[in-house]
Amino acid sequence: MAITIRRAESRDLDKTLKLLSEVLELHAKIRPDIFISGTTKYTREELQAIFDNDQTPVFVAADDSGEVVGYAFCVMKRQPFSTNMKDFSTLFIDDLCVDENCRGQHVGTLLFDYVKQYARDNGCYDVTLNVWE
């Protein structure tokens, strides 16, 4: 299976929402004290606005048929000049997901490599990622 990484488009909304829902349900199962099962992280309109915003690039991994099998939600952040730090940009990975049926096929690695190259191409100092545990 050949995988293509590209910016998310309107045609990717449904599958991205489905993957977001799967991630939310996993989080709700593990941390019901924080996450609410059966809800959504974004509405369709909110997700479209995120797709359209250059400060919040979303990249998708698509298979040969164009089906989205993973995503990386990113946020461009700028550290303004201060008395102790220079001005610089960073690309923050807010969310990364690979479809359960495609795990172990290096889709996540392809997404991460693409994000790193995008950060370099856009003058970012680094790429950051937070994890919960």
Residue ranges: model-predicted function:
Residues 8, 96-98, 131:
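Hydrophobic adenine-recognition pocket in adenosine-nucleotide-binding enzymes
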